Amino acid sequence: MNSDLALIEAIIVTNMRPHFLAVSKEEDYINIVISHPSFVRMTMPERIAKVFDLLKVWGEEVLKNNTVVVQAYCADEMEDLFEFWINDDY
């Protein structure tokens, strides 16, 4: 899973600066910390929005410093994410 996290991090860091803050794994979930989602959705490219769709986000927690933690399943949904980037010639 570490290589999967590295790939996710590389994709998001490359495309979401300065919105991306961190990525980590907890058991069966991946945590992606980004700027407040209402701001990110207004400024990030449509293809990055699709990443979050593919991650099948199930919950968001707004933090005191105006960031949000997005948790997503790590299993089959990860394969869908990689397929999207490969098929998109990214």
State the predicted function of each range.
Residues 1-3:
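N-terminal presequence-like segments and adjacent domain-start helices
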Residues 7-9:
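Helical scaffold of the NTase/Pol beta-like nucleotidyltransferase catalytic core
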Residues 18, 39, 56-57:
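Short beta-turn/strand-loop junction motif enriched in small, turn-promoting residues
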Residues 28, 32, 52-54, 71, ...:
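Solvent-exposed, non-transmembrane amphipathic alpha-helical segments
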Residues 38-46, 63-90:
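Polar/charged, Gly/Pro-rich intrinsically disordered segments
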